[in-house]
Amino acid sequence: MPNEAPIEVETRRHQMFPVLNAADIARIARFGTQRHYPADSCLFRAGEPGPGMYVVLKGVVAITQRDGLGNVTPIAEQGPGHFLAEVGQLSGHAALVDGHAMGEVETLLVPPDQLRALIIAEADLGERLVRALILRRVALIEAGASGPVLIGPPDSPDVRRLQNFLSRNGYPYHVVDATQDADAAALLEQYGEARLLVVCPNGAVLMNPTEDALARCLGMIDSEEHAELFDVVVVGAGPAGLATAVYAASEGLRVIVLDCRSYGGQAGASARIENYLGFPTGISGGALAGRAYVQAQKFGAEMLIPTKVVSMDCSKAHRSGELSITLEDGRQLRSRTVVIASGARYRRPAVPRLADFEGRGIWFWASALEAKLCAQQEVGLVGGGNSAGQAAVFLSQHAAKVNVLVRGPSLAASMSRYLIDRIEATPNIELHPHTELSGLHGDPETGLNGATWRDHRTGTEHDCAARNIFLFVGAEPETTWLDGCGVAVDRHGFVLTGQPASGGFPARPAAALESSVPGVFAVGDVRSGSVKRVGGAIGEGAAVVALIHQHLSGATTTA
């Protein structure tokens, strides 16, 4: 998944393309059905729903990549003992490459649900399969192979917007500058005034699409009606939500996960997390989230990402125990429990013209895409929490200088000691205590070209020619979708749980992570009083599953 360490394809080819022996294939056979394909027939096509995993029994299948501009690139030729799939086939997502029979081909087709069952039932074989599926996706991402083609100026805010969206969702893409490619230039001219075109693998051409429109074109989300009753709907796919999904699905509960943008939440944008248990050398937030995302799907959790939740109906919670979630497209999901894991977003400080420069020099995350923009430049970063510290250290490897602005006297009250030590030891990071961002300069069309910050004790102002400012300030809970459903929140909008939320329970107190509505739980940053750390969020996400079981058991016995 995204942000894994770079893959040397040749050195890891044996892991990416392992050859199954006769015993392996015999173990797989009970999960699939044999399929025959005549010469030159297509087994799967990029942009169309993938049928699952193929195991080649006889013949050879050519794997190629089509970029939507008429270019076809060979990737591999797979013969007997090879299996054809990447990680998207755990959920039957659209294929990223084409597969054609080079002569008569006999295969064993394992559909997505049976692929998940195989991985769990045959643990040692499943480990090899999952490793290969993940490595193949990462290799496609690193190569810029497959996926949509973004045609436009590489420094365009809209190009960067879609790059960030695709990267955060672990989806490969390729950017083409029309000034350097005749075919792209001709296509851009054909669409008149379009400043950005996206060519999807299925051939569809989108003009400066929204993230939702692009996701639908790529088949990242379905449009099916989900009439079944879920055991758990998880709203939010950050560390807390993904932990809930992994543990709930692994224990046999019917789980669906929703997020309006991508998996990983704020933590997914962290360049490196070094104090998470079990990773002594650290791990990027994207890699940690990506592994959890795959893990949840392995156990059968469904993912609807990106999908925006607009409201929740709790009117039946006390009677039938049924809750209803309404999505932005009008679809509804029914569930016996809901876990609110929608997190918090960074606050937008009251700085004049801030909105003019969002995506044009003002950033709320620091990924490799933004780091490239800062090469050998002076930048500003506002915030004193762990996310700010991780971003400062990461950006210092690219920028000439990183100015860290904090309102307080130091970082000690809000940042982990290991990050403070690292910042103090980094010569091109300068801490500005008692300081706040006060002004932004530039043209919205061309972007930010300078900023002003002020010492709030003395009123002294300083101008800096920073073209990029990173904001990691405060936290505003993502809870507007809860309006009107009876879930109690504190004065800042964070969800109350446990004893403070027990007013809605006439017969019993609310459980530790339960809200004021029976069967509605809250975990992670969105919960009032939670520890705003990745480890704490994951712990709450795991712990809530036991409370869900208790609630479902009680609902069953009283029905």
Feature annotation, model-predicted:
Residues 201, 236, 335, 341-342, ...:
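Short, well-ordered coil/turn residues at beta-beta hairpins
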Residues 1-152, 156-164:
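Cytosolic regulatory regions built on CNB/CRP/Popeye-like sensor folds
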Residues 389-391, 509-511, 517, 523-559:
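A conserved FAD-binding loop/helix module that cradles the flavin
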Residues 289-335, 340-342, 396-507, 550-559:
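A Rossmann-like FAD-binding core segment of flavoenzymes
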Residues 196-205:
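A short, hydrophobic beta-strand/beta-hairpin element that forms part of a small beta-sheet core
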Residues 150, 154-181, 187, 234-301, ...:
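Beta1-alpha1 glycine-rich phosphate/pyrophosphate-binding loop at the start
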Residues 211-230, 342-398, 496, 509:
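Glycine-rich dinucleotide-binding loop and its adjacent helix/turn
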